Design a protein with these regions (language model features):
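Extracytoplasmic/secreted proteins, especially bacterial periplasmic and envelope-associated proteins
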Residues: 43, 47-50, 54, 68, ...
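Acidic/histidine-rich catalytic neighborhood of metal-dependent amide-processing enzymes
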Residues: 124-237, 265
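Active-site-adjacent substrate-binding region
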Residues: 192, 204-327
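A non-catalytic alpha/beta surface segment that caps or lines the substrate-entry region
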Residues: 53-110, 254-256
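Second-shell loop/turn segments in exported
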Residues: 35-42, 58-68, 91-94, 123-133, ...
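N-terminal Sec-pathway targeting helices
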Residues: 1-15
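N-terminal capping segment at the start of a domain
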Residues: 22-72, 84, 122, 289-299
Length: 352
């Protein structure tokens, strides 16, 4: 009897160990390193810097309520996206009796189902918002230039959002919440959503990177020299696809977890697509877990690393992410991970 109990306990421990390893592998991939960074398109760094400077200087400040500066930003974004050959439209909506605008650029594909890339253009208060989030918008505009003349399989929508920052964060007045609801109401299929949220701040200093939970430092680097891909359970395959393309350009880490309060997993526009059970990931330099200038007057264009920012955007190869998404069923992981736990539970109780 004791032998059977010991064998059961030993087997359960072994299964738990293997399961833990599978879960860790499922949730995270350590930073990719060792290979030299691949080259990016000449001139990309300068284009990114030009866009950041315009948004953070000419349009400063651009929070909700600063209508003239937000209008400048909207016009600049729309003009740049129009030059890419996309069909550009404004998506106005009302919050607190004021009108706000999302700027949408659609590249029609053979399939009506959409791959969406979004970035918010507003700032928190009177901060310059170079990293948060002129960097993300600059990446969005660069992607528009890369897609010029391309005939995609899936319809691609690039969209610049209003109202990501307070006082509208977490409300239905976020531009991305309005957009997600519009897609739902119009029954437009969404294959994936990629959110560009702060992609320009990097550090090679030791202990320059922090994390939302104790123990995460054992899995992730202590230097802020990587880009992160953040997703929930439904977005594992999407996150892996994005990481696969990006890791030849710079170190990347991936985190896929349930939406746990306090983990800061949903601190941008992708949250509103998760709320609709759509696969979405955030590409980020990890915000205040690395950048000391977050929501501060020091969030200036000169603090950004445009070389590594260009590697995030990666010239032509960010377009490859969109192409590779055509080959995947993005709900595969959700179904199979549920099956994994079902099989584990049945095996445990059967053996015990």
């Amino acid at each position: 009897m004791k032998l059977r109990v010991y064998l059961s306990l030993f087997s359960a421990l072994a299964i738990l160990t293997v399961s833990t390893g599978c879960i860790i592998s499922h949730c995270t991939t350590p930073a990719a390193g060792g290979a030299p960074a691949a080259a990016v398109r000449p001139g990309l760094e300068q284009e990114l810097k030009k866009d950041v400077l315009y948004l953070a200087k000419t349009c400063h400040p651009r929070p909700a309520g600063y209508e003239k500066n937000q209008a400048r930003a909207v016009q600049y974004i729309a003009r740049s996206l129009s030059e890419s050959g996309a069909a550009v439209t404004y998506q106005p909506f009302t919050a607190d009796k004021r009108t706000f605008v999302n700027v949408s650029a659609v590249f029609p594909g053979k399939s009506a189902k959409r791959v969406i890339v979004g970035a918010h253009y507003d700032t928190c208060g009177s901060t310059p918002g170079a990293d948060d989030n002129a960097s993300g918008v600059a990446g969005l505009l660069a992607l528009g230039r890369m897609l010029k003349g391309i005939s995609p399989h899936d319809t691609i929508e690039l969209i610049a959002y209003a109202n990501e920052e307070p006082p509208y964060f977490g409300t239905e007045q976020m531009g991305s919440a309005q957009h997600a609801q519009k897609l739902y109401t119009e029954q437009i299929g969404v294959k994936a959503m990629i959110c560009l949220e702060m992609i320009g701040y990097f550090s090679d200093r030791e202990n320059s990177q922090s994390y939302p939970a104790a123990g995460m430092g054992a899995l992730y680097p202590d230097k802020g020299d990587f880009i992160a891909i953040v997703g929930n359970w439904d977005s594992v395959r999407l996150a892996r696809t994005v990481q696969k393309n990006m890791q030849s350009f710079l170190p990347t880490v991936r985190l896929n977890l349930p939406e746990i309060k306090g983990m800061c997993m949903d601190f941008s526009d992708h949250r509103n697509f998760w709320a609709k059970d759509l696969p979405a990931v955030m590409i980020t330099d990890t915000s205040f877990f690395r950048n000391p200038n977050y929501h501060q007057p020091g969030d200036l264009p000169e603090t950004l690393d445009y070389r590594r920012m260009a590697q995030v955007v990666r010239g032509r190869d960010l377009g490859l992410v969109l192409k590779r998404l055509q080959r995947y069923d993005l709900f595969f992981i959700r179904q199979n991970f549920s099956a994994f736990f079902l099989h584990f539970t049945c095996f445990f109780f059967e053996f015990g």
